[in-house]
Swiss-Prot record:
An example Gene Ontology CC term for this record: host cell nucleus
Gene responsible for this protein: PA
Enzyme class: hydrolase
Keyword field: Cap snatching, Endonuclease, Eukaryotic host gene expression shutoff by virus, Eukaryotic host transcription shutoff by virus, Host cytoplasm, Host gene expression shutoff by virus, Host nucleus, Host-virus interaction, Hydrolase, Inhibition of host RNA polymerase II by virus, Manganese, Metal-binding, Nuclease, Phosphoprotein
Biological classification of the source: Viruses, Riboviria, Orthornavirae, Negarnaviricota, Polyploviricotina
EC number: 3.1.-.-
Name this polypeptide is given: Polymerase acidic protein
Length: 716
């Protein structure tokens, strides 16, 4: 087939087809039928355009012999055969000069006489089938479709064939000749059978046997067989009268569509109750680090060695005591656990060689804190069949909690800049394609905006803690292992820094299933006095463990150092996602990228540089009771990142539900702002679905309060 193509077609056409296949990563040595099809399509496009001109009077004429004196303009602009970037440039230019609507897919030609884009099709199947596939894919009134077949048939939109009879006959004759030549060489059958439909059409394959019975059983109400349902779906017009559509779907439905006006929506009702509490797996804005710069000690990089080195930098330790007890816990056990950690670290230092990991003694306080022997005994269900009153144990409804100001403060803090660099610029090879150059430029600009951000610190801290905990859970299942909470960064001057936030002690961890829980006790340093916001620290027992000297503008001052201790738990699946928190960087980069793309398509050039370097321009960041908050592009990057990070830190079923349900209301409000006159039914049910997710989660409650601010300002 390849030899035939090279003999049969003009070398320029062959070269263009080779380029097209290379652009899509296809091998013409393997996909020979596709190679022939591309050449055929190119030739038909060129023949369609050949000899057709517009004269000075604006009339369409056919000129076969070049008359050098005639001032003629080509009637057709050829788009097919150009590389994608150039082709879109031509399309944009035509749209700008003629006012034509921009097509979704690249067409083949533009007709200056009839002012429309043309899609040419060449098919080895029936023309009407191919025509319908094309029309289904393009879904545009403005692109004219013209299909030719190898049997001399043709079909065009509204039977408007654009060209004169003779020009079309020339194309049909050429296609017939190609078919004959292929048949003579025994290539036609393979070529005819290799044609695939447009990718948007699903093949109709027959379903038989069990699958057929299951399909018939699982139809929506009022459909008696699969064909009946298929016919309904195929004939469903999406933009008809909604009430009619609903009544078609089920006899039970009699929804009345209510107009959605500015006065329709009410604010989301947030729950009353005691203030919500901190539930993240580690401290955020309240965390305190003991740090070493330019670490070069023996065993540097081994967590336990690093932790001991960091602990040695602090000299203000004192006899610990409880300043804020945990309401329901045995607080003396938390105190004893910290004393045990200090004592066992001291024992390590007295040893000749420091071990790589530390297994804690199974003392009564740690057994209590880690819930050892607390789980009810599991009994095989087979042994319980005869028990008459077997039932699942009752679980209490969660207590409703109200929004508290601390979660907004946490979010604001996450958007701020620190004086350290938390991520390095990725070392990626040289750019080879223009798109890679733009992508790496965007990535570098974005990295510069977020590398110092506190949310990025939380990412690196989360990745480290979850990785260390999952490793220990698998490697030392029965041990109470001591895991330092460590992060690494660079100072502004580029010096390496190792930070210790505190310690975790892991309980027994025979994790068979993804959701099996491993208990752990976290002990984290802080300078925050828990008595200022006791409701935030409901789940913690807080000790005072030392005094820290801090340098300030007025000289040195001493501040008490606290230790926040709590029992917590996590699972394999949660640790797996925690290890992948770097994805948050990617998600927020993609959101920024879509903003740049929107700007670039308006200006019709890449706006990355202007977007990041125009410091005077402000962008919307979010809603507050004061109105739409605006800030620099850097602030937008950091806010989007912080949102993504908090979605990971505070992930919960409440958040999933609230996000999914509130999005529906958001879309309706946006439709109202765009003057699309939206209608709704059962708006009360939607509010119910949103509000049942507002129970006690601080991040969900904050998002709901932001949503209310949005409603207020969007509907003014």
């Amino acid at each position: 087939m390849e030899d035939f193509v090279r003999q049969c077609f003009n070398p320029m056409i062959v070269e263009l087809a080779e380029k097209a296949m290379k652009e899509y990563g296809e091998d013409l040595k393997i996909e020979t039928n596709k190679f022939a099809a591309i050449c055929t399509h190119l030739e038909v496009c060129f023949m369609y355009s050949d000899f057709h001109f517009i004269n000075e009077q604006g009339e369409s004429i056919v000129v076969e012999l070049d008359d050098p004196n005639a001032l003629l303009k080509h009637r057709f602009e050829i788009i097919e055969g150009r590389d994608r970037t150039m082709a879109w440039t031509v399309v944009n230019s035509i749209c700008n000069t003629t006012g034509a609507e921009k097509p979704k897919f690249l067409p083949d030609l533009y007709d200056y006489k009839k002012n429309r884009f043309i899609e040419i099709g060449v098919t080895r199947r029936e023309v009407h089938i191919y025509y319908l596939e094309k029309a289904n894919k393009i879904k545009s009134e403005n692109t004219h479709i013209h299909i030719f077949s190898f049997t001399g048939e043709e079909m065009a939109t509204k039977a408007d064939y654009t060209l004169d009879e003779e020009s079309r006959a020339r194309i049909k004759t050429r296609l017939f000749t190609i078919r004959q030549e292929m048949a003579n060489r025994g290539l036609w059958d393979s070529f005819r059978q290799s044609e695939r439909g447009e990718e948007t059409i699903e093949e109709r394959f027959e379903i038989t046997g069990t699958m057929r019975r299951l399909a018939d059983q699982s139809l929506p109400p009022n459909f008696f067989c699969l064909e009946n349902f298929r016919a309904y779906v195929d004939g469903f017009e999406p933009n008809g009268c909604i009430e009619g559509k609903l009544s078609q779907m089920s006899k039970e439905v009699n929804a009345k569509i209510e107009p959605f006006l500015k006065t329709t929506p009410r604010p989301i009702k947030l729950p009353d109750g005691p203030p919500c509490f901190q539930r993240s797996k580690f401290l955020l804005m309240d965390a305190l680090k003991l740090s070493i710069e330019d670490p070069s000690h023996e065993g540097e990089g081994i967590p336990l060695y690093d932790a001991i080195k960091c602990m040695r930098t602090f000299f203000g330790w004192k006899e610990p005591y409880i300043v804020k007890p945990h309401e329901r816990g045995i607080n003396s056990n938390y105190l004893q656990s910290w004393k045990q950690v200090l004592a066992e670290l001291q024992d390590i230092e007295n040893e000749e060689k420091i071990p790589r990991t530390k297994t804690m003694k199974k003392t009564s306080q740690l057994k209590w804190a880690l819930g050892e022997n607390m789980a009810p005994e599991k009994v095989d269900f087979e042994n319980c069949r005869d028990i008459s009153d077997l039932k699942q144990y009752d679980s209490d409804e969660p207590e409703l909690r109200s929004l508290s100001s601390w979660i907004q403060n946490e979010f604001n803090k996450a958007c701020e800049l620190t004086d350290s660099i938390w991520i390095e610029l990725d070392e990626i090879g040289e750019d080879v394609a223009p798109i890679e150059y733009i992508a790496s430029m965007r990535r570098n600009y974005f990295t510069a905006e977020v590398s110092h951000c506190r949310a990025t610190e939380y990412i690196m801290k989360g990745v480290y803690i979850n990785t260390a905990l999952l490793n220990a859970s698998c490697a030392a299942m029965d041990d109470f292992q001591l895991i330092p909470m460590i992060s690494k960064c660079r100072t502004k001057e580029g010096r390496r820094k190792t930070n210790l936030y505190g310690f975790i002690i892991k309980g027994r961890s025979h994790l068979r299933n993804d959701t099996d829980v491993v208990n752990f006790v976290s002990m984290e340093f802080s300078l925050t006095d828990p008595r200022l916001e006791p409701h935030k620290w409901e789940k913690y027992c807080v000790l005072e463990i030392g005094d820290m000297l801090l340098r300030s503008a007025i000289g040195q001052m001493s501040r008490p150092m606290f230790l926040y201790v709590r029992t917590n738990g996590t699972s394999k699946i949660k640790m797996k996602w925690g290890m992948e928190m770097r994805r948050c960087l990617l998600q927020s980069l993609q959101q920024i990228e879509s903003m740049i793309e929107a700007e670039s398509s308006v200006k019709e050039k890449d706006m990355t540089k202007e977007f990041f370097e125009n410091k005077s321009e402000t962008w919307p960041i979010g809603e507050s009771p004061k109105g739409v908050e605006e800030g620099s592009i850097g602030k937008v990057c950091r806010t989007l990142l912080a949102k993504s990070v908090f979605n990971s830190l505070y992930a919960s079923p409440q958040l999933e539900g609230f996000s999914a349900e509130s999005r529906k209301l958001l879309l309706v409000v946006q439709a109202l702002r765009d003057n699309l006159e939206p209608g709704t039914f059962d708006l009360g049910g939607l509010y119910e679905a949103i509000e049942e997710c507002l129970i006690n989660d601080p991040w969900v409650l904050l998002n709901a309060s932001w949503f209310n601010s949005f409603l207020t300002h969007a509907l003014k």
